[in-house]
Amino acid sequence: MAELLPGYSPSFKKPSEILRLSRRRSRSEASKTGLSPFSPGDVIKRVPGLRPFSPGPNKGAGVKRRNPFASLENTVCSPVKRRAETVAEYGAASLEPRALSAVRPSCLGQDSPEPPQFNSVEDVIWGDPLAADADPLVKTESPEKPAPACEIPKGSVTFPADWSLKTRLLFTSSHSFSWADHLKAQEEAQGLVMQCRATAVNLPHSIQEPKLSTDLRCAFQQSLVHWIHPSLPWVQLFPRIGVDRKMAGKNTPWSQDESLQQVLMSEWALSFTSLYNLLKAKLCPYFYVCTYQFTVLFRAAGLAGSDVITAVMSPTTRGLREAMKNEGITFSQPLVEDDTGKKQKKPEAASQGDINPEKENGTAEADEASDESDEDESFSWLEEMGVEDKIKKPDSISIKLRKEKNEVKLDHKPESVVLVKGTNTFTLLNFLINCKSIVAAAGLQAGLPPTLLSPVAFRGATMHALKARSVNVKTRVNSGYKDQFSLEITGPIMPHSLHSLTMLLQSAQRGSFSAGLYTHEPTAVFNTPIHSQAVKEISADLQNCGLHPCTVEQLTQVNELGKLSLRHLEMTDYRYTWK
């Protein structure tokens, strides 16, 4: 082939000769510049994890490009090579491969980091120190890896107030609840006295041995106590809505005895009045009135962002609302007003609950007049056609029923919630005492007065305690089992009890637990905001209301849940998350 083609050289058959000529050329160039020659192979041996390049001298551009088809195993440094000693100093800066640019400061006698290490494919691609336009002193990082920012702790140090009544709480934690079992007689007695005297207990941030903490166990007993009227141990007094089946077979001697019913109602009226007087004096923060049809929540001034006494009633019917209007009770329906989306601003007196009945009646009459005129206009086309006598027009009664159809649709729904403010709450008190429809006339609850629930003692009240039970179970995790501890609380659980229990568990369970909350559905709407707009915080003088100062601080907040309620509560690292 060499003889047939002039200029053809079979030098490729002798690579050793080519390498010898390359080394000779390198030594000659180094001798001219006065630098000590070195072999690229020596650099490869001394640099840990550096893959050998293709043979040949450096020409012109200086550095051979990395083979893009090379195996990653030849490129990525192994953990053993990462711990190799740092590359020694090199004198030939002009002949130094750009792969050693990260160690150039050491050649200048300065402190430098360790040789570049590749931990992933992205580091090899984006962090390649051989990039032609890369600064030798700056490491290029992957654009897909943003700089790590300071992590903001999730959750909040507290949770919003939930004014709904709960029927069951289920706490779970990785730490045992054995400290809540088998209270000693002295601890139980001390807890009852602490509740009667409204003694506030401040526990440490974390308790190492909860079972040995007497203060914790006494405070736990204190948080379970509530007051109720009437007290009939063999009859379920909460909840009262939709529980007729559970009361089947119970002995109810008052159902057929009118004299006994009168005695029960007179005692109930005294207890109800006593509770309202305590509320007005800010010695009771709130209380509930539970009937077989609806539930009423009375709150003292300063709670839920209101500077006056408020009462929330749900669910209601059109007949009940009409009866309240006839008694002169001024009320509002927050959810109905929100749904209509009225653009006109209400006067300030209306926002405070002092609505002028004359103006309200005048507005209603004007609306009725306009509706009647609309009805007359809607039938004018019949007269034009001359058939007005042949077609039967709807009478005034049917027109009125059609107008009231929208009001009837709200009955027994959350949107039927009614809000009463200020002095109208006292009128509501008298209305409920004298209203016969709040007591069932027939059925299993016939003649039974409504249930009064309060966090503090009142006239005719009986002290009750929530039922607590701890259970230890093993849950399967991967290939083994893990201990899971739970604490179940049942009974009429009011807002102060929920907050008190979470404060205790925060210390006893070292800031790590979760809770499932089971809401009495008719009361979930009690979280409806009182004000349509945000209001300033109100300083509430409720130091003597019988609750812990931290609990009072939570209950004074403006409602944030709307017509919803808390279903799940979780604490992690002493911070709450909920849904």
UniProtKB/Swiss-Prot annotation:
GO terms (BP aspect): cell division; DNA damage checkpoint signaling; DNA replication; mitotic DNA replication checkpoint signaling; mitotic G2 DNA damage checkpoint signaling; nuclear DNA replication; replication fork processing
Main location: nucleus
Ranges of Acidic residues composition bias in the record: 365-378
The entry's keywords: Cell cycle, Cell division, Developmental protein, Nucleus
Domain of life: Eukaryota
An example Gene Ontology CC term for this record: replication fork
Keyword Secreted: no
Comp. bias regions, Basic and acidic residues: 339-348
PANTHER family: DOWNSTREAM NEIGHBOR OF SON (PTHR12972), PROTEIN DOWNSTREAM NEIGHBOR OF SON (PTHR12972:SF0)
Role: Replisome component that maintains genome stability by protecting stalled or damaged replication forks. After the induction of replication stress, required for the stabilization of stalled replication forks, the efficient activation of the intra-S-phase and G/2M cell-cycle checkpoints and the maintenance of genome stability.
Family per record: Belongs to the DONSON family.
Protein name: Protein downstream neighbor of son homolog
